């Protein structure tokens, strides 16, 4: 649960069975699940210890996508490669989203505005804009600088 995206094979099963052992989900299990899927569903899963199949996990936001079992790893790897080729602004986006969650909205918006300005100081902004003008969206090869 401590990743940006979670992919599952269609036969995957998830759960927080610790309550059935008389303990609670440790290592962040209560907090991460709640932040991912909301408190009502997280309570249901944590209180019951029941298993969640892949299709339900997708429906409640526990996973980002479900693929055929044999196709899951290649799909996840391709997604990771795609993000790794992305612009420096991806770093700003992740930081602002994660840090902003802990801030009041007005402060989070200031953080976003600062990061927006920082994007204009990157090589990737120049590359992205020129590529858009020359070739349309989604064609740039970024340097992550």
What are these regions (language model features)?
Residues 33, 57, 93, 132:
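Terminal peptide-recognition signature
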Residues 29-32, 41, 92, 112-115, ...:
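Hydrophobic alpha-helical segments typical of transmembrane helices
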Residues 128-145:
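Short, basic/aromatic-enriched C-terminal tail that caps enzymatic domains
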Residues 1-47, 59-60, 75-79:
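CoA-thioester-processing core
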Residues 122-123, 135:
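Generic structural signal for alpha-helix termini and adjacent loop/cap motifs
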Residues 7-12, 54, 63-110, 114-117, ...:
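C-terminal long alpha-helix characteristic of the crotonase
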Residues 48-50, 126-127:
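Short acidic-aromatic low-complexity motifs
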């Amino acid at each position: 649960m401590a990743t940006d995206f979670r992919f599952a094979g269609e036969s995957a099963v998830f759960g927080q069975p610790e309550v059935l052992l008389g303990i609670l989900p440790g290592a962040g299990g209560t907090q991460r699940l709640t932040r991912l899927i909301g408190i009502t569903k997280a309570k249901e899963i944590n209180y019951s210890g029941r298993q969640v199949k892949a299709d339900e996990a997708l429906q409640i936001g526990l996973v980002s996508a479900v693929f055929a079992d044999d196709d899951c790893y290649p799909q996840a790897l391709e997604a990771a490669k795609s993000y790794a080729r992305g612009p420096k602004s991806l770093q700003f986006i992740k930081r602002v989203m994660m840090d902003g969650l802990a801030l009041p909205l007005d402060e989070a918006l200031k953080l976003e505005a600062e990061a927006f300005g920082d994007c204009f100081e990157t090589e990737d902004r120049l590359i992205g804009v020129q590529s858009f003008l020359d070739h349309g969206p989604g064609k740039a090869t970024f340097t992550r600088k």
